[in-house]
UniProtKB/Swiss-Prot annotation:
NCBIfam families: ATP_synt_6_or_A, PRK05815.1-4. The keyword Transmembrane helix applies. The chain crosses the membrane at residues 18-38, 76-96, 114-134, 166-186, 193-213. Keywords: ATP synthesis, Cell membrane, CF(0), Hydrogen ion transport, Ion transport, Membrane, Transmembrane, Transmembrane helix, Transport. Key component of the proton channel; it plays a direct role in the translocation of protons across the membrane. One of its GO terms (cellular component) is proton-transporting ATP synthase complex. GO terms for molecular function: proton-transporting ATP synthase activity, rotational mechanism. The keyword Disulfide bond does not apply. This is ATP synthase subunit a. Its main location: membrane. One of its GO terms (biological process) is proton motive force-driven plasma membrane ATP synthesis. Disulfide bonds: none annotated. F-type ATPases have 2 components, CF(1) - the catalytic core - and CF(0) - the membrane proton channel. CF(1) has five subunits: alpha(3), beta(3), gamma(1), delta(1), epsilon(1). CF(0) has three main subunits: a(1), b(2) and c(9-12). The alpha and beta chains form an alternating ring which encloses part of the gamma chain. CF(1) is attached to CF(0) by a central stalk formed by the gamma and epsilon chains, while a peripheral stalk is formed by the delta and b chains.
Amino acid sequence: MEEAKIPMLKLGPITFNLTLLAVCIVTIAIVFAFVFWASRQMKLKPEGKQTALEYLISFVDGIGEEHLDHNLQKSYSLLLFTIFLFVAVANNLGLFTKLETVNGYNLWTSPTANLAFDLALSLFITLMVHIEGVRRRGLVAHLKRLATPWPMTPMNLLEEFTNFLSLAIRLFGNIFAGEVVTGLIVQLANYRVYWWPIAFLVNMAWTAFSVFISCIQAFVFTKLTATYLGKKVNESEE
């Protein structure tokens, strides 16, 4: 059997996984389309799609209120909402269909089922919270937090690294495992024709459970982002 080849694009020293890039673009398009559709023709008394959008915004605002000072919460509400919606859509993207090449390579997976993507997303969050910490509190005050108390400086730096790593691995582990189990259930249906009804029912139940877990992971990711951000920008953390 011919070995499956992953579509790649090389631009100078950087190599892009075209499959991952494509599903990321699809994720962004879905998020944009949903917000654009739900925010059209908004009314003073919300109903239908507007109610759903406002509920999501209020839900994410509640996360920010728990971890950010009141005067800062509104400044980051849109960021947290975007992160939550993006991760929620990305987590669920690979659950509902499968697109394989003749070599057996799956072209349609959740972006968050790719460890490199999760590490990049986690790195973005880590850099963002530190940049915001410097912008809000100043470089000296920001570095002072990492060195207070000074004997704990190595542990504080280690904590920053473990926060970055755990944010990515937690997301990857849950989403990747969900897609693996979904693939095994589909293989069960292909094994024998009389297994198909059982596999169908099991797959429906597992998909519903996976959607729930994916949304929980989006919530956890957003909550941890708000937590890390609050530690860097809140005046109460002085």
